[in-house]
Amino acid sequence: MKRVLIIHGPNVNLTGKREKEVYGDINYEEINNLIKREAAKLDIAVKIQQSNSEGEIINLIHSAENNFDAIIINPAAYTHYSLAIMDAIAAVSVPVIEVHISNIFGREDYRKTSVTASKCKGVITGFGPYSYVLALNAVKLLEDSIGG
C-alpha cells in the first residue's frame, strides 16, 4: 500500500467559511473525507496535515523522506512566493503534486505565479476539492507506470 502525505497550507482549514465564490461551499472536514474515501478506493494510505506556518510545512515536507511514497500539497498563498517551500520540495526524493481548489491562472495577476510548481512532478488546479482526488489518481498512475 502506497503512503501519501497530504499537506494543506494556510487558511485551507477555513474552506467552506471564506470566499465561497472562489473555494465553494464544501468545508475542510468534507474535503478530508473526500480524500480518505478516494484513497481507500485506490488502496492508498493517507496522512492529512494542515498548517498556517511556513516552517511547519517545510518540516512536514522533510518528514516525508523515507516515510511516504508521495506528497500532495496545497501550498495556498505560499505558492506565489515561498522559495523556502520550493527548496524543501526540491530537497526530497519523493514525488510532489501541487494542488489548488481554485484555478490560480484565472485569478488575480499575483496569484498566477507558482514558484513551488517548478519543483513538483505536476500541478492540478481549478477542480475544487476534486483537485485532491485527481492528484491521488495521479499518484496511482505514477505507481502503475513505474511498476512500484
Curated annotation (Swiss-Prot):
Which catalytic reaction applies to this protein? Answer: 3-dehydroquinate = 3-dehydroshikimate + H2O
**Pfam family for this entry, one:** DHquinase_II
Keyword Membrane among record annotations:
no
**Keywords for the protein's UniProt record, in alphabetical order:** Amino-acid biosynthesis, Aromatic amino acid biosynthesis, Lyase
Question: What Gene Ontology molecular-function terms does this entry list?
Answer: 3-dehydroquinate dehydratase activity
Q: Where is this site: Transition state stabilizer?
A: 18
Subunit description: Homododecamer.
Q: What does this protein do?
A: Catalyzes a trans-dehydration via an enolate intermediate.
**Could you tell me what this protein is called?**
3-dehydroquinate dehydratase
Give the encoding gene's name: aroQ
